[in-house]
Each structure stands twice: as structure tokens, then as C-alpha cells.
Amino acid sequence: MSATKSSLKSTLAVSLTNYLDAGAIVAGASGLTLWQSYLGLSEGHLGWLNAISANCLGAAIGAIIGGFLADKYGRKAIYTYNMLVYMLGVALIMVSVNFPMLLLGFLVTGISVGVGVPASWTYISENSEVGNRGRNIGISQMAWGIGPLIILLLGTLLAPPTGEAASGGLLFGLSEVVGGWFGVEGAALNVFSSRIVFFSLFVVAFIAWNLQRRLDESAEWKAAKAEAEKQPKQATAGSVFASFGKLFTNKTNIFTMLFLCGMYLTWNLVCSVMGFFQPHIYETAGGLSNEYANLLAAGQWLVIIATTFVFSLIVDKVKQRWLYAVGVSFGVLAWVIVLFLGINSLSGLLFFTLLWALQAGISVQSFYALWASELFPAKYRAAAQGVMFFIVRGLSAVWGLAFVYIYGENGQGFTLAASIMLAFFVIPLLIGTIGAPVTRGKTLEQITRERYGDDF
């Protein structure tokens, strides 16, 4: 098998991690009002679900653990066991009958997602050819779009009649049949739609586990490991977190992490809220039914996938600085338009959804995944990503808790929340456009030598 085909095959297998990451977030989002009705949850409860989920703190905890584990024991070690933890978390959500069970399921799933992210982005970059790193990261981001699309379509088909809708989705009868086996009705019956959606993630996680545990170890990690073993024992001894100090004692590392966190953090503050609360916002502030909110969001993900595909074709061939600037500008314009036209306006919702989809297709996350895997040496490449992901998702958890109180029970604070998110989006536009590195066409070893010298 050629190197190009091999890297593409491994990219597709590892990309299932992105599918399950975004899928877990959107599965929670698409059924949020159903769980709220079933368990009698307040906006504060919803804020906690977001805060500890794959969207925020759960992933943050998993990332800092997974990053160091991937550097010490290898990328393959993560793929051998992590999906089993994901399946456990999803299973807990599927059988939840109270808020603590649901919260625990979201937390376990989130931790698993976080553990897998640094290893997956690092593995993809290390197994890509020089001219295909951006393409392969783009393909992995397509999985990040395909997951929500499938989940939202499934959620739409299974949606119960809510809001002004006279009937449920085309497959709501399946939920009624399954719910009937357990003798449930009302809100308890409606939430079976969400349980089935999470079951679909369980199935995909099982497939991912079988594919990923058969992957070969990263050749670059093995080379870095072999080089480290040649060093005196006292230079390499230490715990799993032995490289933690090295990250913060090198000026190049510090400036790189400040740059990457600066561009990714405020973007993620906005996108974490939209990833988890978008259908809920469309229902409460926008006045749509659960079915139509999910359908509009699903249409958005179709545009995201198409835009990401175009991104994957051109990112290795154009100046990445300007491609980045165009993508983030779409997001800034989206918030300007929704503030001007209003969330209650159908035209405002449609324009916002389209522009939001375009920015997500050429997303800050795509560039973050690419640059974060290029700008650090192999020996702590995943650990550096784990630290940054921990910071970003951890602070996103705090913002998610604040957002629900700003937004209000029925969206009365939407204008203020949207104004804040517009301000958040301007920050990565400036930081990323000004500080974009020039790495296109260079090997990872060449980039490392240029930035760190021969000692690394």
C-alpha cells in the first residue's frame, strides 16, 4: 500500500474520534429540551450538563491526561482502550432515570473524548505526507461535521411532537414502540428518542474501537522514544507527567501555547455554547419546534461538511493566513447579522445559520489542530495539545455556566449573550491572522529544527 493511501486509511479510522466528539455534544444538544422536560431540569441543570460534558470540562480533564499518556506510552495505547470508556459513558446516558446518572454519563463520555483528541490530531499529522497534512486534518474535521449531521437527522426523524408541531418525526413511532416495552408515556416516552440517538453513538464507538486498536504505532513517536532511551536514565526518568515542566521552561513553547490558546480559546467559548445549546436557542428564543430546530441545524451541518471538503482541498496550496482570516470573518458577520435582524426573524435565523456554517467549515479548530501538531517536538507534542485543550475546554465550562444565566429561562437575554459572543469572535480573528505560522510544505522535523534548533 502506498504511503498516501496508508495515511488516508489511518486518517479515516482516527477521524471517528472527531465523529464521536461532535456526535456526543450534538446528541446532548438535540435532546436537551426532552431531558429537561423528563427530569424537570432548570437552565442551571442544563448549564452543568454542558459544563462537564464532551463540550467542556469532561473533555478538558481527559485531554490533559490523554496528552501525557500518548507521549509516554504511544498513540496506539490510547486507541486500544479509550473507546471502551466512551461506550460506558454513552451507556450510562442511555439508561439514565435521574439527573445524577445523566450528569455522570456526560462526564465519563466527555473524559473519553478528551483523552482521544490530542492523540488523534497528533497521529494524523505524524502519519501524513508533507503536502497532505492540512488535507488530512481537513478530512478529520469532516468527520466532526458528519457526526452532528447524522445525529441531528436521526434526532429530527425521532423527534416527538413539541412546541407548535402537531406530529413528531417520521420515526417517532419507533420511540413509541420501544417506550411501550417499558410502559412509559408522556415526557418519559419522548425522551426515548434521545436514548436511541445515544445508542447510535454506542454502535459507532464499538466500530471505532475495532478499527483503531489495529492501527500501527506512529513512526515518529517510536523514533522520538528510541532517541530518548539513548539518553542517560536520570535525563529520562520520571512519571507520566515528567515532560510537564519542560513545556513551561522553554520560551518557544510558552509563546506557542499563548498564541494557540489565544486564537482557540475565545472561538471555542462561542462554539461550545452553540454546539450544545443551538437547537435549544432556536426553540426558546427563536420559537421553533424541536423537529424544525434540529432540521435547521442539520442543514447547517451539510454546508459545514461541504465547506470543510473544499478547505481540505486547498489548505495545503494557499496562504493559510488569509484562508484563516476569511473563515473567522464569516463568524463575525454571522453575529452582526443576527443582532441586527433578531433571532425571532426567519431571515435572520437563515442568514446566521448559513454564515455560521461557512465559518465552521473553515474553522479555527481546523487550523488549531494543524498548527498545534506542527509547532511542538514529537516528544511532547500530544502533551502540549492536552494542556492547551484542558485550558480551553475548562474555561469553556465556566463560560457555559455563565451563559445560561445571561441567556435566561426563555432566551430573554439573547441580545446581551450574542453581543458578548461577537466580541469573543473578533479576538481570534486578530490573533490568528497576525500570528499565523508559515509551515506549509515543510516536514515536521524541519519545523522543529527551525523553531528549537538541533537539540530537539
Model-derived regions, located:
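Extracytoplasmic gate region of multi-pass secondary transporters
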Residues: 29, 251-308, 400
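Cytoplasmic helix-loop-helix junction between adjacent transmembrane helices
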Residues: 105-142
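Helix-breaking motifs and short loop linkers at transmembrane-helix boundaries and internal kinks
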Residues: 74, 95-100, 341-344
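Helix-to-loop junctions at the C-terminal end of transmembrane segments
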Residues: 63-74, 308-320
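Cytosolic juxtamembrane N-terminal segment immediately preceding the first transmembrane helix
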Residues: 1-26, 37
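Glycine-rich segments within core transmembrane alpha-helices of 12-TM secondary carriers
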Residues: 134-163, 204, 389-400
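Extracellular/periplasmic helix-loop-helix junction of adjacent transmembrane segments
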Residues: 29-61
